[in-house]
Amino acid sequence: MFPTGWRPKLSESIAASRMLWQPMAAVAVVQIGLLWFSPPVWGQDMVSPPPPIADEPLTVNTGIYLIECYSLDDKAETFKVNAFLSLSWKDRRLAFDPVRSGVRVKTYEPEAIWIPEIRFVNVENARDADVVDISVSPDGTVQYLERFSARVLSPLDFRRYPFDSQTLHIYLIVRSVDTRNIVLAVDLEKVGKNDDVFLTGWDIESFTAVVKPANFALEDRLESKLDYQLRISRQYFSYIPNIILPMLFILFISWTAFWSTSYEANVTLVVSTLIAHIAFNILVETNLPKTPYMTYTGAIIFMIYLFYFVAVIEVTVQHYLKVESQPARAASITRASRIAFPVVFLLANIILAFLFFGF
């Protein structure tokens, strides 16, 4: 039934398999035991934060150096930034003797040591970061440098548009179980910007950092927070000849009706200039920021509409008085309108400037 000599060959194969697998099983048991009882090799996600020195919190000094800032979107209230992020802190576990080591500075990979978990609060999605350098001094001071790019969300205030100034914020926090463990500080020597940093249509005034004294709760954990502020002001000169002056010229043309005696001509003039103003306003509206509050430009546009409304009433009253055989009274109202409209318009603009700019 079976080939001759089959049973002895099967027995020999089983014996050979036992001789092969028994040593391998023993090695596996030893390796599992070493992994179970040996201390872990700490990496960035495994090393616990260094303990406070002399019952003081661990201070992480931060700095952001702007390389470029671009694509400021008024409607989305976002901007893009390309910059360096520098961190420094002391970890005594990394201290070494430069004489014995033969080096004055040691370099590490990000996975080899503990690194504070710095997060950008108002960044859309996650920042794109490339670690440039991680170096450690003999006393354990760690210098961390990365280059990053991000799209940042920052609320804008358009109340004074187009004469507005804005503060663009970049918020940093550090994750910590207890605020006594890790706090953020500003390294002023590492805060700055390139001289050629610019934003189209804006003047960059300053770039500073502010430490927020009050921590806030996030996911039942307290955070330490920094606020990097980029102060900018809008280049408003182009808005004057392109938006403001055309609206004023159209309005002033309608006032020539106060020097005409023809009712039909006056009505045609006022209504046609009103239509021109509406058409121009629709064209300008596409470039104006959409806000739930009144802006300075919006207030001027609304005020101009009011003057058109009053001008139509004046022309109608003037014609009514003439029909009712009161030409003298109609003429006096017309003469008064020639002075009253410009004066009231000037006073209204002064009031608006005071309300929006606090002069």
UniProtKB/Swiss-Prot annotation:
One GO cellular component term: plasma membrane
Record annotation: effect of changing residue 268 to A: Increases the binding affinity of TBA. Weakens block by Cd(2+)
This protein's encoding gene: glvI
Outcome when changing residue 297 to A: Marked gain of function, with a ten-fold shift of the proton dose-response curve towards lower concentrations. Also shows slower apparent rate constants for activation and deactivation
Activity regulation as described: Tetraethylammonium (TEA) and tetrabutylammonium (TBA) inhibit the proton-activated currents in a dose- and voltage-dependent manner in vitro, whereas the blocker of acid sensing ion channels, amiloride, has no effect. Channel current of GLIC can be inhibited by inhaled and intravenous general anesthetics at and below concentrations used clinically. Ion conduction is also inhibited by lidocaine and by divalent transition metal ions such as cadmium ions.
Spans through the membrane: 236-258, 262-286, 295-323, 327-359
Pfam families reported for this sequence: Neur_chan_LBD
Disulfide bonds: none
Spans within the Cytoplasmic topological domain: 259-261, 324-326
Protein name: Proton-gated ion channel
Location(s), subcellular: Cell inner membrane
PANTHER family assigned: NEUROTRANSMITTER GATED ION CHANNEL
Family: Belongs to the ligand-gated ion channel (TC 1.A.9) family.
Primary localization: membrane
